[in-house]
């Protein structure tokens, strides 16, 4: 057994002198491996009387356990040293700035809507909204649009059934507002509208904004002044503007507004007019006492003119190369 004690001492000394995990594993194999010094001690048990073998085996196992514990402790120490060394090499400078997050941006049509809302809110206009699934009364009848009008045709309007449709204009919001509120009324109504059309300058869904004023003594002069101020504010230049006579069932007189483009050609930007007396009567407002004006414009159309976009469909394709230009 004195030889066993020497082996344990040698093993512990070898363990302490190991400088890395690989060297430590070599010590383990040398003393505890299949042919290790301590493992081979078990073969000497056959030379002992049967009654002495259990006690001798226990002593050998105890020696192996001591060496194994020494191996485990040394391995933990070496791994800790290695970890600390690696962490020291991987030190993070917390004073460095973090990774830059790419900022998003508003869609160009959203920019246009917010810009227009901001302008008209300064003039006392409130923002009004309404349902996109509309009935034929609010979308057509109340607006003085007769049954034979082309806008009611299936090829222009998305109908659900005989009376329900996807609104073709936000004018229904004006009707609902006038039904629920007595003059004076001053609103703008932005929102999505739907028409059965798709090409370079038309999409089945687009954004429209309409404006409405109803009060006493409202004249066409008020309409012209308001739209002159708006267009010059929106395009940020002293534009040449003209009002061209037109026809809309819900206004009388009616006009379309053009601005002079950089190429010397007139560009249509919106439609407008004085609210038709029939429309006022349909919502219970006396046209002998009150008058008003209304205007409507496509948000995509104005956005195209402001930013020089040539294809309306680009606004709906979610191409980041296009959208990032407006950040």
Curated annotation (Swiss-Prot):
<dbReference type="GO" id="GO:0006432">
    <property type="term" value="P:phenylalanyl-tRNA aminoacylation"/>
</dbReference>
<dbReference type="InterPro" id="IPR002319">
    <property type="entry name" value="Phenylalanyl-tRNA_Synthase"/>
</dbReference>
<comment type="subunit">
    <text>Tetramer of two alpha and two beta subunits.</text>
</comment>
<dbReference type="InterPro" id="IPR004188">
    <property type="entry name" value="Phe-tRNA_ligase_II_N"/>
</dbReference>
<keyword id="KW-0067">ATP-binding</keyword>
<dbReference type="GO" id="GO:0004826">
    <property type="term" value="F:phenylalanine-tRNA ligase activity"/>
</dbReference>
<keyword id="KW-0436">Ligase</keyword>
<dbReference type="InterPro" id="IPR010978">
    <property type="entry name" value="tRNA-bd_arm"/>
</dbReference>
<protein>
    <recommendedName>
        <fullName>Phenylalanine--tRNA ligase alpha subunit</fullName>
        <ecNumber>6.1.1.20</ecNumber>
    </recommendedName>
</protein>
<dbReference type="InterPro" id="IPR045864">
    <property type="entry name" value="aa-tRNA-synth_II/BPL/LPL"/>
</dbReference>
<dbReference type="Pfam" id="PF01409">
    <property type="entry name" value="tRNA-synt_2d"/>
</dbReference>
<keyword id="KW-0547">Nucleotide-binding</keyword>
<dbReference type="GO" id="GO:0005524">
    <property type="term" value="F:ATP binding"/>
</dbReference>
<keyword id="KW-0479">Metal-binding</keyword>
<keyword id="KW-0963">Cytoplasm</keyword>
<dbReference type="GO" id="GO:0000287">
    <property type="term" value="F:magnesium ion binding"/>
</dbReference>
<dbReference type="Pfam" id="PF02912">
    <property type="entry name" value="Phe_tRNA-synt_N"/>
</dbReference>
<dbReference type="InterPro" id="IPR022911">
    <property type="entry name" value="Phe_tRNA_ligase_alpha1_bac"/>
</dbReference>
<dbReference type="GO" id="GO:0005737">
    <property type="term" value="C:cytoplasm"/>
</dbReference>
<comment type="similarity">
    <text>Belongs to the class-II aminoacyl-tRNA synthetase family. Phe-tRNA synthetase alpha subunit type 1 subfamily.</text>
</comment>
<keyword id="KW-0460">Magnesium</keyword>
<dbReference type="InterPro" id="IPR006195">
    <property type="entry name" value="aa-tRNA-synth_II"/>
</dbReference>
<keyword id="KW-0648">Protein biosynthesis</keyword>
<dbReference type="GO" id="GO:0000049">
    <property type="term" value="F:tRNA binding"/>
</dbReference>
<keyword id="KW-0030">Aminoacyl-tRNA synthetase</keyword>
<feature type="binding site">
    <location>
        <position position="252"/>
    </location>
    <ligand>
        <name>Mg(2+)</name>
    </ligand>
</feature>
<dbReference type="InterPro" id="IPR004529">
    <property type="entry name" value="Phe-tRNA-synth_IIc_asu"/>
</dbReference>
């Amino acid at each position: 057994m004195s030889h066993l004690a020497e082996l344990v001492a040698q093993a512990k000394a070898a363990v302490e002198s190991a400088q890395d995990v690989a060297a430590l594993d070599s010590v383990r194999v040398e003393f505890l491996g299949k042919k290790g010094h301590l493992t081979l001690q078990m073969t000497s048990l056959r030379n002992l009387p049967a009654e002495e073998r259990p006690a001798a085996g226990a002593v050998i196992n105890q020696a192996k356990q001591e060496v194994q514990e020494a191996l485990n402790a040394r391995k933990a120490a070496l791994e800790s040293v290695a970890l600390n060394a690696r962490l020291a090499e991987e030190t993070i400078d917390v004073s460095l700035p973090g990774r830059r997050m790419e900022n998003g941006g508003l869609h160009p049509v959203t920019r246009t809507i917010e810009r227009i809302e901001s302008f008209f809110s300064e003039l006392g206009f409130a923002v009004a909204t309404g349902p996109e699934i509309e009935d034929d009364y609010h979308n057509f009848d109340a607006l003085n649009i007769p049954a034979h009008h082309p806008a009611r045709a299936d090829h222009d309007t998305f109908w659900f059934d005989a009376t329900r449709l996807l609104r073709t204009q936000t004018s229904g919001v004006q009707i609902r507002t006038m039904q629920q509120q007595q003059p004076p009324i001053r609103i703008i109504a932005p929102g999505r509208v739907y028409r059965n059309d798709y090409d370079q300058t038309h999409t089945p869904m687009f954004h429209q904004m309409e404006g409405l004023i109803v009060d006493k003594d409202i004249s066409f002069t008020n309409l012209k002044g308001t739209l002159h101020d708006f267009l010059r504010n929106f395009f940020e230049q002293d534009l040449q503007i003209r009002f061209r006579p037109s026809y809309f069932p819900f206004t009388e007189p009616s006009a379309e507004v053009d601005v002079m483009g950089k190429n010397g050609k007139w560009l249509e930007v919106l439609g407008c007019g004085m609210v038709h007396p029939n429309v006022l009567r349909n919502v219970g407002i006396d046209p002998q006492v009150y008058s008003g004006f209304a205007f409507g414009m496509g948000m995509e159309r104005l956005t195209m003119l402001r930013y020089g976009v040539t294809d309306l469909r680009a606004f709906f394709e979610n191409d980041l190369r296009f959208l990032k230009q407006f950040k």
